[in-house]
């Protein structure tokens, strides 16, 4: 026998060669044995034969004969078994029509197969009638059972089926587009069942779980196993996708044999309940490549069970080869398990793709299969049959052999087995190389973190490049994620902004509404001291270690450090200022370089969900009571009063706000809150000695929650008390130090125990890179050492608090050593991998485990310590996807490295449980960065301004206004710089989170314009300063839209905030005021909200000069002082004489002068071809709004509201009498633009107590705020003495 065959050429079953004959034989052998079970229903072999014979009788009566297709439209049930065997007994072929299939596919299968009779369950009949052609007869088992054969007719005989008769037709998808029906004959499936019986004892001793959807070929040996005498347990609908439901079924029915795809097998293992299936003896894995890693996991999880890897296209009748896995051979070998040797009666041939000649051992070729299990062909598709079922002359002069062309690649192993090498049609030309996608998928699946993987190629619509995208599902056992097994997507992918948004919302604080009616006491020391600010910003999570080498002396100095006090006193002796100073350490610290506020202590996830409540009497001059410390406003808020006892006390009750942490963390919530409490207590222990004080644990009294008015769900964490300092105390912590690869001078790599001021070698085993949280692994590699702290506190409530205290102490060192936490234990059975690893190390050395905290560290530079930005957070922005890609570099050539790795919670599966690559390719996750959005150039001035900053920040050219910031490569660090630059350039005060909430140029522009348009913000801050200098208030020109004042606000450089005043009427639903007097009155009311008292600095541009003048007059009449009134270009630009001489100041579109001025409000010019086109085409407000919207990209409704404001105010003039009675005491300066008409003040007198300063500018009415703004700024700064 040649290597190309290696099989028994004759079928193993002799004599009876049809399925009905085999079943009849089993009925004769054990008629009362259970043939099929479904939930609590059972059928014996005799009952199955009887019911299927009755159905066959009815079908024969309806005209069914050999090779006819009869549809089977039933859900998993006993009806399915009776239906399949009844159709076979009638001599026909059954066509599985799974009700789970899409209706279009079902409709196609029915029509293409020319099926005329379909058996359906009663409840599915109405649905089937909508799918099937009208000439199709629908029958039910109820009808067949009621059928009585007419007298004089004979019942059908089982012998009506022959070995070459069709047994069933399976529709399978392929590269040809439409599904095609594969015709399987009795002799083929009989051979398959005979092989299963002889090779793997699928016989009366076995209980088979039928869980594969019946429309797939692999389901057929499950359904037809009664022919071998086995009992078949029908799984519930959808159980193939429910690992835990499968396990329950296996246990309930004592299933011995299970068939599943590797994806499902991984799911069963990950449940950790798979070992409960004690009855299970055999696991058949097929349908996808079985990775060596999964095989190892399976044999370790289910020792003693047979694991068989099977392979076979539908066209070769289910399984054409198999390979029993030997656990002893799994330590080495290829990444995927061999598909083994051909089944009985089947031959394998691996041929060169070009010559169709056999290849040698180790050479890759295309697999062809021959033998008795080959399908007859494709139903009604002779063309496809001829393409795939070929007559090939394997040797010169030899008789041609009928072979099926699989399209799969393989190679012979030295032992005569076959190694699957991917699909011939799954090779792509990428980056100049021919790449096998299955090879990449298998390589990724052998990564410890990866549960399942698939690789696809997608084109980038903009660049035209091909992107290789790896889609992965993380292993719940191996991937080190926070909230392992219960994690949200934000732990697997750093594209999620969930955690950042939570952090920005101050989730741990009490709501302001809760505190509004309670007495609040402002504490002294709201402005932190330089020492406080420096030490708080020095206390950060360090992810870079740039300070050089670490020595043994450094570690001993770190671990031996103590804080001493020069004196001791009681808390009652604290002055109010000292109490404020102490608590200021626990408040927020803000830096313009950071997206998030900073605290002096660490908090898991930076959520700061632990609250402090002070129970005070005789301290700080406060009345006895329970006070909440509000860290943003540096206040103590009285929650409830306390009856005076005459004894001074200062106790601190710690409360964990569940709602503040639960959106981000699901596991170990209590533990992380207790650790955070420890960090806070540790901070107290560091700062109190300077005041002669210390903090001691006092009691665990959960009843105190009732006095603090907190939510029932919130956690009481413990009570501490401020006491006189009495010297150093035992910290109840046991410390182990591990050194990394020669990075600590004097200490070789290993585990050391710190005791009595010395480090003693404890073990060679250390926490490894893979044992820390995935996103921290690159930091681990940079770290010089790691520290494990074990809590030996006696009281349960103090155990995790002790851990946080110790790390806080170590963080606040003066040795330039920085740390990052990397794992902790759990009270609730969810320890992180570092904890499990250290427990094993301790256990191997006879030391009991306890609550623990692990962190890595290294030396940091002075620059790092002093930095107030977010540089240390940059590493933390890399998630498991990026880290896995880094690891792929070590075992894949560079041209096979994916451009992206996309993490899925679960990869989509097809109905037969395989990874659905088409669904992956169409998924939102894959296409998030590839979506071919149309390029939309910036349209408005605001969009153009934002785009310029955007492109610079992201280092991208030609940004579309619809590009997503984060999908374009942005992150939190870049967001900080982007927002700061936007605020400076545009004179606005966008909050840092605005990029998170409005992540496109378009949305940012809308947000900016919307905020400008809000009535609550009619005084729009165009330039922000943090000092206390009085602001400049400036009114814009006609239309009242202040954005054209941004350049002036940004260029003036007075160290003062600059507000532009938006007219009432710009916002939707507002009606402009009817007089300047009313306008000024309402503006003063809004002004008082910003600046309650004078002196006021008022400026006005163009028409805004009139409003500024009236506002100054009304303020002075109210007794306020105006220190400067600047009237900038108070005259109107001169329009063409013919445009204004007839209509004067009438606001009418018939008045070409008015239309010209209105045009200039939006364009900043009163000439040019656009104006000419406007004057020619515009006839009313609606047409003008449409014209401007098209010209400038402004919203039509906003344009109409601005037009309305202009129309109302265009005619505003002071009468001679009104102006005569208005005399201002404020100094007035008039800046006249070249070419303007006279203003409302000229040719008048008496309006100013002092002669005004008049400055003639070279700039015109519009350029003075644009290209010539430098001239105006120079004159203003000179007048102000700048």
UniProtKB/Swiss-Prot annotation:
- Indicate the segments forming the Carrier domain, all copies: 937-1012
Q: Which cofactor does it need?
A: pantetheine 4'-phosphate
A single GO cellular-component term from the record reads: cytosol
Q: Which PROSITE patterns match?
A: AMP_BINDING, CARRIER, PHOSPHOPANTETHEINE
The record, for NCBIfam families, names: AA-adenyl-dom
What is the UniProt domain comment for this protein? Contains only one module with an adenylation (A) domain, a thiolation (T) domain and a thioesterase (TE) domain at the C-terminal end. Contains a putative oxidation (Ox) domain integrated into the adenylation domain.
Q: What function is annotated for this protein?
A: Nonribosomal peptide synthetase involved in the biosynthesis of the blue pigment indigoidine. Catalyzes the synthesis of the blue pigment using L-Gln as a substrate. Two glutamine molecules are cyclized and oxidized to form indigoidine.
Q: What is this protein called?
A: Indigoidine synthase
User: Per the UniProt entry, what species is this protein from, by scientific name?
Assistant: Streptomyces lavendulae
């Amino acid at each position: 026998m040649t290597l190309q065959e290696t099989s028994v050429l004759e079928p193993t079953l002799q004599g009876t060669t049809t399925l009905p004959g085999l079943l009849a034989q089993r009925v004769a052998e054990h008629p009362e044995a259970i043939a099929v079970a479904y939930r609590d229903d059972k059928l014996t072999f005799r009952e199955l034969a009887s019911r299927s014979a009755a159905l066959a009788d009815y079908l024969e009566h309806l005209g069914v004969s050999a090779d006819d297709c009869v549809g089977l439209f039933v859900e998993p049930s006993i009806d399915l078994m009776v239906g399949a065997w009844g159709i076979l007994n009638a001599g026909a072929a059954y066509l599985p029509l799974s009700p789970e299939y899409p209706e279009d596919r079902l409709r196609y299968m029915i029509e293409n197969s020319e099926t005329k009779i379909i058996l359906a369950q009663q409840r599915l009949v109405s649905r089937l009638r909508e799918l099937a052609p009208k000439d199709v007869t629908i029958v039910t088992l109820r009808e067949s059972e009621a059928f009585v054969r007419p007298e004089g007719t004979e019942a059908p005989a089982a012998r009506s089926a022959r070995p070459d008769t069709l047994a069933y037709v399976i529709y399978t998808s392929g590269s040809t587009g439409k599904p095609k029906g594969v015709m399987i004959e009795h002799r083929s499936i009989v051979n398959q069942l005979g092989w299963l019986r002889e090779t793997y004892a699928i016989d009366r001793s076995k209980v088979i779980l039928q869980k594969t959807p019946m429309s797939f070929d692999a389901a057929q040996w499950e359904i037809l196993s009664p022919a071998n005498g086995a009992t078949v347990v029908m799984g519930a609908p959808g159980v193939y996708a429910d690992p835990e439901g499968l396990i329950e079924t296996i246990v309930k029915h004592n299933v011995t044999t299970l068939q599943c795809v590797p994806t499902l097998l991984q799911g069963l293992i990950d449940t950790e309940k798979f070992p409960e299936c004690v009855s299970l003896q055999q696991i058949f894995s097929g349908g996808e490549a079985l990775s060596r890693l999964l095989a190892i996991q399976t044999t370790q999880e289910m020792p003693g069970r047979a694991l068989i890897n099977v392979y076979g296209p539908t066209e070769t009748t289910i399984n054409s080869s198999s390979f029993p896995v030997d656990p002893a051979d799994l330590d080495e070998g290829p990444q995927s398990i061999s598909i083994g040797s051909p089944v009985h009666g089947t031959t394998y041939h691996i041929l060169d793709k070009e010559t169709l000649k056999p290849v040698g051992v180790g050479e890759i070729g295309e697999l062809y299969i021959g033998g008795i299990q080959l399908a007859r062909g494709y139903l009604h598709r002779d063309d496809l049959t001829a393409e795939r079922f070929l007559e090939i002359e394997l040797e010169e002069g030899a008789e041609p052999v009928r072979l099926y062309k699989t399209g799969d690649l393989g190679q012979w192993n030295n032992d005569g087995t076959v190694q699957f090498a991917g699909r011939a049609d799954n090779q792509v030309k990428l980056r100049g190389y021919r790449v096998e996608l299955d090879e990449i998928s298998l390589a990724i699946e052998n990564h410890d973190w990866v549960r399942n993987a698939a690789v696809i190629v997608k084109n980038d619509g903009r660049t035209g490049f091909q992107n290789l995208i790896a889609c992965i599902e993380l292993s719940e056992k191996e991937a080190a994620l926070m909230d392992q097994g219960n994690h949200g997507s934000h732990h697997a992918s750093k594209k999620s902004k969930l955690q950042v948004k939570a952090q920005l919302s101050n989730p741990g604080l009490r709501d302001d509404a809760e505190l509004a009616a309670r007495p609040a006491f402002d504490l002294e020391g709201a402005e932190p001291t330089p020492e406080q600010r420096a030490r708080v910003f020095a206390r950060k999570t360090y992810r870079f270690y740039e300070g050089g080498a670490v020595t043994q002396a450094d570690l001993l100095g770190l671990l031996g450090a103590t804080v001493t006090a020069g004196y001791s006193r009681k808390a009652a002796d604290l002055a109010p200022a000292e109490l404020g100073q102490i608590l200021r350490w626990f408040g927020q610290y803000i830096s313009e370089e950071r997206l998030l506020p900073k605290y002096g202590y660490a908090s898991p996830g930076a959520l700061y969900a632990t609250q402090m409540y002070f129970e005070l009497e005789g301290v700080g001059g406060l009345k006895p009571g329970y006070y909440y410390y509000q860290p943003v406003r540096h206040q103590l808020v009285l929650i409830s009063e306390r009856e005076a006892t005459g004894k001074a006390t200062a106790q601190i009750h710690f409360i964990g706000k569940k709602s503040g942490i639960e959106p981000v963390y699901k596991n170990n919530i209590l533990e992380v809150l207790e650790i955070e409490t420890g960090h806070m207590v540790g901070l107290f222990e560091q700062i109190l000695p300077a005041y002669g004080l210390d903090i001691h644990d006092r009691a665990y009294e959960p009843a105190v929650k009732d006095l603090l008015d907190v939510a029932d769900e919130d956690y009481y964490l413990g009570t501490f008390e401020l006491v006189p300092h009495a010297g150093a105390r035992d910290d109840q912590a046991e410390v182990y130090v591990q050194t990394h690869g020669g990075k600590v001078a004097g200490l070789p790599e290993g585990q050391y125990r710190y005791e009595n001021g010395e480090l003693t070698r404890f073990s060679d085993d250390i926490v490894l890179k893979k044992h820390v949280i995935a996103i921290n692994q690159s930091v681990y590699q940079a770290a010089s050492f790691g520290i494990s702290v074990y809590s030996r506190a006696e009281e349960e409530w103090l155990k995790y608090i002790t851990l946080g205290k110790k790390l806080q102490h170590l963080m606040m060192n003066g040795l330039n050593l920085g740390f990052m936490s990397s794992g902790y234990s759990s009270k609730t059975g969810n320890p992180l991998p570092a904890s499990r690893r250290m427990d094993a190390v301790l256990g191997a050395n006879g030391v009991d485990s306890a609550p623990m905290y692990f962190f890595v560290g290294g030396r940091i530079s002075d620059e790092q310590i002093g930095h107030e930005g977010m540089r240390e957070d940059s590493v933390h922005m890399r998630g498991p996807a990026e880290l896995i890609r880094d690891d792929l570099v070590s075992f894949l050539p560079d041209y096979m490295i994916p451009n992206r790795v996309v993490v899925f919670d679960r990869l989509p599966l097809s109905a037969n449980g395989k990874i659905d690559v088409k669904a992956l390719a169409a998924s939102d996750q894959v296409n998030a960065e590839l979506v071919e959005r149309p390029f939309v150039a910036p349209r408005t001035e605001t969009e153009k301004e934002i785009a310029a900053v955007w492109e610079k920040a992201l280092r991208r050219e030609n940004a579309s206004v619809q590009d997503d910031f984060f999908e374009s490569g942005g992150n939190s660090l870049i967001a900080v710089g982007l927002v700061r630059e936007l605020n400076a350039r545009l004179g606005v005060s966008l909050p840092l989170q605005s990029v998170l909430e409005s992540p496109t140029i378009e949305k940012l522009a809308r947000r900016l314009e919307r905020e400008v348009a809000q009535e609550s913000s009619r005084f729009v801050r165009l330039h922000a300063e943090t000092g206390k200098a009085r602001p400049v208030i400036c009114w814009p020109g006609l239309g009242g839209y202040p954005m054209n004042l941004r350049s002036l606000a940004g260029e003036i450089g007075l160290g003062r905030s600059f507000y532009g005043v938006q007219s009432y009427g710009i916002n939707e639903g507002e009606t402009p005021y009817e007089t300047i007097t009313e306008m000024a009155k309402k503006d003063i009311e809004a002004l008082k909200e910003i600046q309650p008292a004078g002196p006021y600095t008022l400026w006005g541009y163009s028409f805004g000069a009139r409003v500024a003048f009236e506002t100054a007059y009304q303020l002075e009449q109210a007794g306020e002082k105006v220190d400067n009134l600047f009237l900038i270009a108070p005259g109107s630009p001169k329009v063409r004489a013919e445009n204004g001489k007839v209509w004067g100041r009438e606001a009418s579109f018939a008045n070409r002068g008015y239309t010209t001025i209105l045009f200039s409000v939006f364009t900043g010019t009163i000439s040019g071809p656009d104006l000419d086109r406007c004057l020619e085409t515009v006839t009313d407000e609606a047409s003008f709004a449409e014209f401007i919207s098209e010209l400038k990209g402004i919203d039509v409704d906003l344009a109409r509201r601005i037009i309305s404001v202009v129309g109302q105010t265009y005619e505003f003039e002071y009468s001679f009498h009104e102006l005569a009675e208005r005399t201002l005491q404020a100094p007035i300066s008039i800046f006249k633009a070249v070419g303007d008409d006279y203003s409302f003040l000229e040719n008048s007198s008496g309006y100013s107590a002092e002669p005004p300063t008049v400055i003639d500018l070279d700039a015109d009415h519009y350029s003075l705020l644009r290209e010539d703004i430098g001239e105006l700024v120079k004159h203003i700064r000179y007048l102000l003495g700048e």
